[in-house]
Amino acid sequence: MATVTSTTVAIPSFSGLKTNAATKVSAMAKIPTSTSQSPRLCVRASLKDFGVALVATAASAVLASNALAVEVLLGASDGGLAFVPSSLEVSAGETIVFKNNAGFPHNVVFDEDEIPAGVDASKISMPEEDLLNAPGETYSVKLDAKGTYKFYCSPHQGAGMVGQVTVN
């Protein structure tokens, strides 16, 4: 059988106490707050935001500089052996990006007899044994001397894969 025992518990009453307003203020002043760390967190967050903005700006500058480059495709969309465009004009110092558009191996060689006087063809040409084999592979060059430059793809020159760039 279960037995129940009863115990008397006294609960104190606080109804007769008076509060002191000065004590409240001093108690509030002693409460530690985390506001001393907030500026540090804000600075870290601001630096993080600044870093993200800086990276985005740098990426935009890189993309913009690539957008200003002239692109010449090595191989036509229909599979033809051609530079597209085969003739172009650029400003001195402007970047020309030759991009393999097909799966055929191509290169870019400037004809030493068909470039402005004083320009070294070996410094602006790909070595004839080097090839851009896969679609999307690129070769970039900047031509500084004004004049007309004729170029060709050494494996496909006999098939008419030649081009010309005029530097103004």
UniProtKB/Swiss-Prot annotation:
Main localization, broad class: plastid
GO MF annotations in UniProt: copper ion binding; electron transporter, transferring electrons from cytochrome b6/f complex of photosystem II activity
Signal peptide boundaries: none
The UniProt record lists the keyword Metal-binding: yes
Plastocyanin-like domain span: 70-168
Annotated Gene3D superfamilies: Cupredoxins - blue copper proteins
Cofactor(s) required for function per UniProt: Cu(2+)
Transit peptide feature, positions: 1-69
Keywords recorded for this protein, A-Z: Chloroplast, Copper, Electron transport, Membrane, Metal-binding, Plastid, Thylakoid, Transit peptide, Transport
Record family assignment: Belongs to the plastocyanin family.
Function (record text): Participates in electron transfer between P700 and the cytochrome b6-f complex in photosystem I.
Classification via PANTHER family: PLASTOCYANIN MAJOR ISOFORM, CHLOROPLASTIC-RELATED
Name assigned to this protein: Plastocyanin, chloroplastic
Organism: Pisum sativum
Taxonomic classification: Eukaryota, Viridiplantae, Streptophyta, Embryophyta, Tracheophyta
Gene that this sequence comes from: PETE
